[in-house]
Amino acid sequence: MRRRWMGLLARADAATIAARLAEAPALPPHIRLRGPETGLVMTRGRQGGDGAPFNLGEMTVTRCSVRLEDGTVGHAYVAGRDARQAELAAVLDAALQDPDRRPALLAAVIEPLAAAEAARTAREAAKAAATRVEFFTMATMR
């Protein structure tokens, strides 16, 4: 469950997260343990998905860690330099670990983000499907 919400928060932009938070219960106060700070990470790849690993290149990542007043710690790593996104994601990660807050935050923030991501993926798949070539059909047309 945590892996899912951390992934959704990492892929959403700060404006979208903030808009969803406007409809959610107020987040608890927090203090920053680390960052937000931006750095580089080496990305690795594998030829064909299962070949020998190689260094593909570096990418920019922003990370943040926060602690809520009840002691719960939240973390976030996001691609790019958006410090606001990293901090919002870390605070939400910490808040979502509380079983009392989780249902309201899932309904107000995480589920709408998941639905938007699923719709975006479906649109992209439909767009790609429109350009698909059926080689069997081409062979029978000759």
Predicted regions mapped to residue ranges:
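Small-side-chain structural scaffolding
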Residues: A12, G57, T62-S65, G74-A76, ...
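Short capping/connector residues at structural and topological boundaries
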Residues: Q47, M59-V61, A83, A118, ...
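Cysteine/selenocysteine-centered motifs that mediate thiol-based redox chemistry or coordinate metal-sulfur cofactors
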Residues: R2, A10, L96-R142
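Charge-rich, low-complexity N-terminal segments
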Residues: M1-P25
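A hydrophobic, small-residue-rich beta->alpha segment in the mid-to-C-terminal subdomain
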Residues: D70-E111
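Structured beta-strand/loop patches that form or line metal/cofactor-binding pockets in enzymes
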Residues: E23-D70, H75-A79
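Residues in flexible loops and secondary-structure boundaries
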Residues: I17, G39-V41, D50-G51, E69, ...
